[in-house]
Amino acid sequence: MRKFNVNVNGTVYTVEVEEVGGAVTAAPAAPAAPAAAPAAAPVAAAPAAAPAPAPAAAPAAAPAPAAKPAAAAPAGSVTVSAPMPGKILSVNVKPGDKVEAGDVLLILEAMKMQNEIMAPEDGTVSEVRVNAGDTVATGDVMVIL
């Protein structure tokens, strides 16, 4: 048994963990690292040039158009974005509604679970960008207060 102190949100917990086959895992890891490091140094120079252009080209084309519509929120407003991808089951507010911090704005279904999306602060709903049945991606703006 090994003991660890784990800090979660400022609270320290003492955790005991039982090692199961720990010696077997540690032995192959040590020889693999030195063998990979010398082999990677000469080979890394050639492959590094090929992968770098491919990832740079793909993200530049796709995220740029998606970011511009999401960033069009009025100054001084609060945006409520999707914390995870999912499907909008219901929208509980409409433009002009006054909401308080913690009020449920909409229900987002993700991984077969219904998640209540709540107002982060008091305000008035100025825009609702989703409808029931819409699919959203992580970071999509759903409501503007």
Swiss-Prot record:
Alphabetized CDD domains for the sequence: biotinyl_domain
UniProt-listed InterPro entries: Biotin_BS (IPR001882), Biotin_Carboxyl_Carrier/Decarb (IPR050709), Biotin_lipoyl (IPR000089), Single_hybrid_motif (IPR011053)
One protein family per Pfam: Biotin_lipoyl
Keywords for this protein: Biotin, Decarboxylase, Ion transport, Lyase, Sodium, Sodium transport, Translocase, Transport
Record-listed N6-biotinyllysine modification sites: K112
GO biological process, one term: glutamate catabolic process via 2-hydroxyglutarate
Residue span of region Disordered: 52-82
UniProt catalytic activity: (2E)-glutaconyl-CoA + Na(+)(in) + H(+) = (2E)-butenoyl-CoA + Na(+)(out) + CO2
Gene3D superfamilies per record: 2.40.50.100
Pathway in which this enzyme or protein is active: Amino-acid degradation; L-glutamate degradation via hydroxyglutarate pathway; crotonoyl-CoA from L-glutamate: step 5/5
Domain spans labelled Biotinyl-binding: 77-145
MF terms in GO: glutaconyl-CoA decarboxylase activity
Enzyme Commission number, as recorded: 7.2.4.5
CC cofactor: biotin
Transmembrane segments: none
Record has Glycosyltransferase as a keyword: no
Subunit structure of this chain's protein: Heterooctamer consisting of two alpha, two beta, two gamma and two delta subunits.
Biological role: Biotin carrier subunit of the primary sodium pump glutaconyl-CoA decarboxylase (GCD).
UniProt name for this protein: Glutaconyl-CoA decarboxylase subunit gamma
